[in-house]
Amino acid sequence: MTTSGLKPKTYSIEGVRPIIHPTAFVHPTAVLIGDAVVGPNCYVGPGASMRGDFGRVIMEEGSNLQDNCIMHAFPGMDCVIEVDGHIGHGAILHGCRVKRNALVGMNSVVMDGAVVGDSAMVAAMAFVKAGFEVPDRILAAGTPAKILRALTDQEVAWKEEGTRDYQRLVVRSHASFQECDPLTEEEADRPKLDAGASVPLFVKKKAE
């Protein structure tokens, strides 16, 4: 939901309606159908789709589902993002479980029955096949995805910092997000956004 009066596209099916916690931010172009549950302090980005028309799709507290992501599941199955889960732009989750504090990279696909463990990461563009399990604090990558190595403390901390920025974006969006007309030219004193401190991982590694 938004404080600007703009509402996401929500649809019931067979009398089952989506649930959006009042502290969550769901972009007005996101689509939620049926048995879709968005928990406290979650962020759902532009163009995201949560289709709860077969199985249940669930976002637990503090998780984020970024632009153009898809969540869906077979009948009788759940698709779950646990607490502080982080789903990058364009990823597809189908009947899988992304566990606490885990990250799924941009344009990755995680298939039915797969599990991404606590504080684990799936690299961008990966394909996690059905039933595959990524252990806790492990990096998986490739098509199909394979176990690469254990994550470092620095990498896990980097992920957590990025997730906190999305949790702050929820607050920022509730406070100031609104539809507007664009300017026709740049102002001389155009301000920069106070958007947080996270940086790309390669930048962080170079700096430390």
Which residues are covered by each model-predicted region?
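A positional/architectural concept
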Residues: I19-A73
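Glycine-rich hexapeptide-repeat left-handed beta-helix
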Residues: M1-I19, D53, E61, D67-C69, ...
